[in-house]
Amino acid sequence: MAPSVMASSATTVAPFQGLKSTAGMPVARRSGNSSFGNVSNGGRIRCMQVWPIEGIKKFETLSYLPPLTVEDLLKQIEYLLRSKWVPCLEFSKVGFVYRENHRSPGYYDGRYWTMWKLPMFGCTDATQVLKELEEAKKAYPDAFVRIIGFDNVRQVQLISFIAYKPPGCEESGGN
């Protein structure tokens, strides 16, 4: 284009003057004999915890909580139903992802559990889901049972949590 057609709107920007002074900030001062100075997270120790790397398996969405009571399960199922999701129960002897047949992920590596009966289309009562959970626990007492919430409009699973852990399982909590 011709130079006369283009309108130039140059703006001036102040040159970079460096970072703001940190003199007013509460920072530990470094000592001259150490490259790290007096670095300390002592003030934060009360609020930080480290997850143990052995002995506690993480299973599903709510696995960081203590085992769910019947009342807790009812509340979760009622939330699932209020959200217009279809409840479904699944079970598995191994409650976590594993690879047995191949190094790469595949269909039979523990991500897919066996469905207990059919999805509970039309279910409106949380106690119906709990009755199915009790039946699944009686039929497979040594299996993990989880409840999932399926959105049949978007065709996706939106919630999943362990509802029963078999006795003797790490962190089973007697649920």
From Swiss-Prot:
Alphabetized UniProt keyword annotations: Calvin cycle, Carbon dioxide fixation, Chloroplast, Photorespiration, Photosynthesis, Plastid, Transit peptide
GO BP, sorted A to Z: photorespiration; reductive pentose-phosphate cycle
Gene that this sequence comes from: RBCS
A Pfam family the protein falls into: RbcS
Principal location class: plastid
Keyword Plastid: yes
Domain of life, per lineage: Eukaryota
Molecular function (Gene Ontology), one example: ribulose-bisphosphate carboxylase activity
Species of origin: Oryza sativa subsp. japonica (Rice)
Compartment(s) where it occurs, according to its Swiss-Prot or TrEMBL record: Plastid, Chloroplast
Annotated GO CC locations: chloroplast
SMART domains, per the entry: RuBisCO_small
Complexes and interactors: Heterohexadecamer of 8 large and 8 small subunits.
Family stated for the protein in its record: Belongs to the RuBisCO small chain family.
CDD domains from the UniProt entry: RuBisCO_small
Annotated function: RuBisCO catalyzes two reactions: the carboxylation of D-ribulose 1,5-bisphosphate, the primary event in carbon dioxide fixation, as well as the oxidative fragmentation of the pentose substrate. Both reactions occur simultaneously and in competition at the same active site. Although the small subunit is not catalytic it is essential for maximal activity.
Keyword Thylakoid: no
Region (Interaction with large subunit): 60-64
InterPro entries, per database record: RuBisCO_ssu (IPR024681), RuBisCO_ssu_dom (IPR000894), RuBisCO_ssu_N (IPR024680), RuBisCO_ssu_sf (IPR036385)
Transit peptide: 1-46, 1-47
Miscellaneous note of the record: NADPH and 6-phosphogluconate function as positive effectors to promote enzyme activation.
Protein name, per record: Ribulose bisphosphate carboxylase small subunit, chloroplastic 1
